[in-house]
Amino acid sequence: SKYIEYPEFEEYISKRINGEWTAKVNELKTRLLRGKEIAEQINILGDDGVPVEYHVIFWKSEVIDYVILQQDAFDEVDAVTPMERQEDILNLVVDICRAEYKFDGFLEVMDYFKKLINLCKQMNYAEFKSEKFEDYKRQIREMVAERQ
């Protein structure tokens, strides 16, 4: 969104949420762009033609896309996301993206991140702060910790 570029908006968000919000959003925007660039390289060079780290960067951008940018308009919970929930999910996705992962090959990366995205999507369907929501969040954090 262009709003994030305006100082007035940043000031408003800093008061309404916190001072780190715009920096985190900009970080995720940069990761999305980097993921798109890497997707193009993978398409040209093939999966084996790029380092495993490139696949990790690409799949981190997919997490951002699937978990934050895509919403299910037909789901009562996911259709409308209050600010507190947005902040919580954004922080979780930032943590996922900042984590360093260890993989032996690109297929391992793909399988891992598909499972992680699925858990995140299931969390998006759960009522915020419910037992189910918190359980999904715990599973996600455990899954991230296992690969570090």
Predicted regions and their residues:
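Conserved catalytic/coupling modules of large nucleotide/cofactor-utilizing molecular machines
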Residues: S1-Q148
